[in-house]
Each structure stands twice: as structure tokens, then as C-alpha cells.
Amino acid sequence: MDTKTLIASEIAKVVPELEQDAIFNLLETPKNSDMGDLAFPAFSLAKVLRKAPQMIASELAEQIDESQFEKVVAVGPYINFFLDKAKISSQVLEQVITAGSDYAQQDEGQGRNVAIDMSSPNIAKPFSIGHLRSTVIGDSLAHIFAKMGYQPVKINHLGDWGKQFGMLIVAYKKWGDEAAVQAHPIDELLKLYVRINAEAETDPTIDEEAREWFRKLEDGDKEATELWQWFRDESLLEFNRLYDQLHVTFDSYNGEAFYNDKMDEVLDLLEAKNLLVESKGAQVVNLEKYGIEHPALIKKSDGATLYITRDLAAALYRKRTYDFAKSVYVVGNEQAAHFKQLKAVLKEMGYDWSDDMTHVAFGLVTKGGAKLSTRKGNVILLEPTVAEAINRAASQIEAKNPNLADKEAVAHAVGVGAIKFYDLKTDRMNGYDFDLEAMVSFEGETGPYVQYAHARIQSILRKADFTPSATTTYSLADAESWEIIKLIQDFPRIIKRTSDNFEPSIMAKFAINLAQSFNKYYAHTRILDDNSERDNRLALCYATATVLKEALRLLGVDAPNEM
């Protein structure tokens, strides 16, 4: 039990007027540590008990069982709790040393599935930094959900269908060179895609031609299908090479095309429930009762189905296949209206499990303040960016530790980790400006800074030749150790908050705080001095490294033992 919960439970025993959760939320951290570790304001009880807050605080402080604390005192209208630091540090260190990387493992999920729709790049387009956010946020959430006891199912809902394939076929037939595409598939396909879009702005016949080729593709035309399959296969080879570099895996690559034969059922269900309404020749579902002004456009006047129809089919398929406890869509914030409509249509169809679906939205990545766009050729490609990050990491490692063994593997972990961490430390609803130099810096709130703190601790433990014993009692009571102990003790709550809010930045900020607290401790403490506290200090180092490594793992970032 963490200290806040302990205090709330002890207060609840003498204050039946308030629920324990309400007490928990009222607890404050005094600005001055001389006033205690946590304080409960008695103002909230003044009306109920019809007494002055000072009197309430004084009376309750007398009734609270002090055996769990160093002391409990009333100061004005507050009850101030001074924690038994030696006792709590002993408990926390024992828990981490005993559990190792399983420390803070929780069982909320009880093995139930969480479907995570993530990454989902478009076939025949390069994997850009714009796709990175969905990939790394989704991957981190998968680790977090597993830590909460769920079974994550990572789905790469590939953009492998749509009018853009009509455009690409037109471009390839006009200017394509098979040998060039085979040699550099994505580069060549991108050039064709950008060129055809530029021409389409002045030549309206291109759009019609593209629509015609896409209609052929929908009808199973041999030439169209073979070209589509070729574009898809070449793109996937390139994507998988990048996913390997990022250490990201998937459980399903069912993309948009997978649902082509599953949309008729959606239309039949909507018709059977009398939900389809005709509007200007199109078929729509009205959603005004859900506060959604625009109806969901299900089928256009020319009979073509739309993106939402496909997503309805995907939602039904995933519920039947995975029976998910949660279904998460890690997709940019610009799709917010679409996902509101999707959930509302499913609700109208009578599927209450739509309440278990969440759009995990995120802000844009910009470069020099400008929005990125594949169509306009203004794009930061991930592959060369990862290579440059690894090179920058390698240069810094060479300068700091030229004799390091396995430099290439460490540079890869630091370079890739830097890009991921920088993305994840940003509140997901906020965008960020892409700055590789800032990402790979060993100073500031960065991945390499946290990784370096972990590597530094491993170096200390190697020098001391120290491995903690699960049967030894370790404890510390000094102020700087206490700051670290409090953070380590808070780790289970941080995991739950990250999970509840679908917000990996909570975990990233925790990792930064823990690394900063340890570095402060390291600067002010002679850890290896041979005195009676040495093993206690080393046990704290061991616990800190264990939690730092696990926090980084939950972000999808490796923690090298040497840097």
C-alpha cells in the first residue's frame, strides 16, 4: 500500500463522514518538509461537523493511530503526517529487490484483450515521422496494458485501399519504370505520387482516370489487382525493415482491403435496423441525438462505400475475433469527428461495447513550424532520420567512452530510444517541432539522459560488486534518499495513471524525475564510502536502476548497462 492510501485509510477510520477516495484526493504535500510529508485539510469537514477546522484537526489528530507513522500533529486547520522513512524505505526496497522487473505488475486486465489500432501507414508511401507518433504511442500503450494485466493485440490497419491507388496506377502507367521501382520501390512510388497529384491540380481528367482505375480494382480487374498487390508487397518489405529497427511488432496486418468483403454485412445490418436514411442520393445515419450535427455518410450516390463503413466492419470483426475489453485507435486528432461518428453509429446499431472504444488522439509533428505533407513532398522520412540519430549517438559515445564494448548496439539503442522518448514525453494532444539535435542530447529531459542515469548506476554496482539479498533488510532515512524512495513507491500508481489516461507522457516524465533525483543524490552522496550505510545506499541504487529500466521498457526504449 502506498503512503497516500495508507494515510487516507487511517483517516477514514476516524472520519466516517468522508469516503476514503475523497480523503485521498484532499491530501496535500506541504510546501515545507518541516511541516510533514502529507497533510489533510479539515475545512471540508467544518460544515458536516459544525466545528472550526482547527478544532476538528486537533481532535482527529488525537484519534488517529500513530503506530504507522513517525508522528501525527495538528497545525492550525491541517493534520500533518510525518512518515516513518526508515520503515517505508525498507518495505519499498524489499518489494523491488524481491520482484525485480515484475515490480508494480498489476492484474486489472485479468488477461482480457485490448485491441490497439496503431501505426497504419499508407501503402506505396514512405514511412514518415508523421507515422511515428501512432507507432510509438501505440507500442508504449501495449507495454503499459500488459503491465496492467491485459493482453494487447497490436493491429497495423494498413492504408492499402482507396482512390490513391487509382492515382498511383495512372502515374505508373504514364511514367513508371519497373526496374527503377524494383530497385527503390518507395522512393520511386513517392515520386510518381507527388508528380500525379501536381498534374491533377491543373488537369481534371486525371481524377476521373484515377477513379476509373480504382473502380477496376474494386471489380477485381487482373492488371489493377496485380499492380496493387505489387505496390503492397514492396511497401511492406520496407515497413518491416523499419519496424525491426524500432523494435516494434504487430499481431495483425489486416488493412483496409481486408474488409472489402465484410462491408455488405454492415449495410444489411443498418438496413435491417432501419437506420439508413436517403440524403441527396446518398445513404446516411442521423446522429443528432448524440449531439453530432453531421450525419454519418455510409454510401455515396454512386454506390461507393466510405471510410466509416469499412471502420464499422473492422470494429465488428475485432469484437468477434478478440472480444476486447478495450479497443483503442491511436490516430491523429484531425480524425476526432470520424471516431465520434463511428462510436455513435455502433451505439445506434445496439452495440453497447462501443463504450469500450477510445480514440487516442495526438497532435501534429511539424518541422520549422510547418505541417508535413506527403502529397506536397514536404516530409521527414524515418529511415534516414533513424540512421542520423544513431550516428549522432555514436559520436557522443565515442567522445565520452571510446573504449566501450559493443558501441554499435549501444548507439542504436540510444539513437532510436532518443527519437521515441522525445515523442512520448510530449503530452500526446500537443504537437512538437522535430529537432534531432535536441532529441539525441545527453543533457536535459531526453531519452539519452535517462539511459545515462541507468548506465551510471550499473557502473556503480559493478564497481562495488554488489548484488542485493532478498533476505537482508535495507533502509534509509536521509532527505535525498527519501525523494527517490517516494518516486519508486509511486511507480504502480504512475503505471495506472498512464493506462487510465492513455498517456505515455506520464511515464516519460516519471522516468525523467527519477533520473534527475538519482543524479542529485549521486552528486551529493559518497555512495561507495565504506561505512555502515554503504549497502543501504547500494540497495537504493539497485532499486532505482530496476525501476528506471522498467519505465524505459514501458516506453519501448532500451536501457544499456554501459554508455
Curated annotation (Swiss-Prot):
Its EC number is 6.1.1.19. One of its GO terms (biological process) is arginyl-tRNA aminoacylation. It is found in: Cytoplasm. SUPFAM superfamilies: Anticodon-binding domain of a subclass of class I aminoacyl-tRNA synthetases, Arginyl-tRNA synthetase (ArgRS), N-terminal 'additional' domain, Nucleotidylyl transferase. It catalyses: tRNA(Arg) + L-arginine + ATP = L-arginyl-tRNA(Arg) + AMP + diphosphate. GO terms for molecular function: arginine-tRNA ligase activity; ATP binding. Keywords: Aminoacyl-tRNA synthetase, ATP-binding, Cytoplasm, Ligase, Nucleotide-binding, Protein biosynthesis. Belongs to the class-I aminoacyl-tRNA synthetase family. This is Arginine--tRNA ligase. It comes from Streptococcus pyogenes serotype M18 (strain MGAS8232). The gene is argS.
